[in-house]
Amino acid sequence: MTVSYQLDVSSGNPLLFLRLLGRWRGSIWKSVVGDLFVWLLFYYAIYFAYRYAFSKQLQTVFEEISIHTDDRMKYLPLTFMLGFFVTTVFERWRSALNVMPFIESVALSVAVLLPGKGREDRLTRRAIIRYVVLHQILVFRDISMRVRRRFPTLKYVVDAGFMRQEELDVLESVNQESSQTYWVPINWANSLALVAHQQKLIDQPTAFNNVIFAIKEFRVAMETLIKFDAIPIPIAYPQVVFLAVRVYFAICLVSRQFLISDMKSKTQMDWPVPIMTVLEFIFVIGWMKVAEVLLNPLGEDDDDFEVNSIIDNNISRGMAIVDTTHGYHPDLVDDVFSDPNYLPAYSENSQIPRNLTGSAAKVELAAPTDEVKIVRVNPEDAPPTSERGSMFTRRNAYSLRNRKISIASNNLESPSQERKFNLSMPAGMLNKSTQPDRPTMETVSEEHEPSHFYRGDRVHSSDSGLSKTQQSSEESVDKKG
């Protein structure tokens, strides 16, 4: 039976924590006590042999071995291996829990989409639910020992009422042709739904598709559990983890002994009980036991899934939905919530609820009567979004740096210093407040151009169509001429 302890941790009261530690079923104490008892037997056997049976020479050799192994215990990365292993096993355990199928979705779909009140309608609904649960039983018999013990043979399934004798005969005849017959009850349920659709018990094709889809989802969930059981974690992984943990504490039988010689290796305290090693044993072995339990959640441990209870609940709830309570609903009357003066009701001992409010909802930065000045902000004047500036700002700074290098190489005065702005910058980057009369890029024309400016890597002059480099080259040609 799954151990429920949610009530014990319903609050942070320290006494509730003590109640949680006091649990026995499924607890760390129950998992570790047997291993700890065996380990202590071996520990004290070596303890008495070392102190009372060994000679001085053997004691010296034993102490050297103890010191050597104790210094190298860190070579076994137990925390690393157990951490990854438990995480992997827990993810598989959670996946198996999430796909565990319940009958409600199938039963509600069948009850709504096959709404007839006749005897054939009623028997069809009940048979579909029974076949779906029978499919679940056949799967659980092969992957769960608890269900296998409940139904050792298919004859027990017939005696429990989940299957009739003639249905068992058909199932056994199919079993001679196929090794697995999980699909047979699902095929029966689909065939019943098809016949109901052909006889107009299920009117619309979309309704028929919805019934088939609900049955399919149940079958897919059971197929996932079959894969979970048939394809486990590669066996080498749990082997190396379980072996490493047990080898570690086997070495501790020697390395954690209290030494009594006069050597420098003599321990400062001589305790008869290795308290710290026992605590380490409880925590590490308990951690490993968690992984062992989670490896097969369909087993027979205290914390494994209650699959027999799931089967019983599925058949009882499914039949209640499609038959016992089918088509019934209470009379329509006005409810108390329609009263505008209605207030939520709580028992006298219950806790008053707290509404969900934002963390800054009750912060008052201004009174309702305060006059708050609204300032219009131009997005173009906003500072960069980070200390390093935007990508455009960094790219523009890089182009300005290249321009300064080009100006210095030509020994010319920087036009940006002369005109107070740079023609390569877009209009949005210009400071319009300090340069109201300066033209922007959109309004720059020949009459507004500076006396000399850059276009690419050449300096042009507005006085003539030739660049200064071209004029200087022509002058040198005239002189040579």
UniProtKB/Swiss-Prot annotation:
Residues 462-474 have a biased composition (Polar residues). It is a multi-pass membrane protein. Signal peptide: none annotated. GO terms for cellular component: chloride channel complex; plasma membrane. It holds the Pfam family Bestrophin. Residues 49-95, 252-274 are extracellular. The keyword Transmembrane helix applies. InterPro entries: Bestrophin (IPR000615), Bestrophin-like (IPR021134). Residues 445-461 have a biased composition (Basic and acidic residues). Residues 1-27, 117-230, 296-481 are cytoplasmic. Keywords: Cell membrane, Chloride, Chloride channel, Ion channel, Ion transport, Membrane, Transmembrane, Transmembrane helix, Transport. Its main location: membrane. The chain crosses the membrane at residues 28-48, 96-116, 231-251, 275-295. One of its GO terms (molecular function) is chloride channel activity. Residues 427-481 are annotated as: Disordered. It is found in: Cell membrane. Belongs to the anion channel-forming bestrophin (TC 1.A.46) family. Calcium-sensitive chloride channel subfamily. Forms oligomers. Forms chloride channels. This is Bestrophin homolog 17. The gene is best-17.
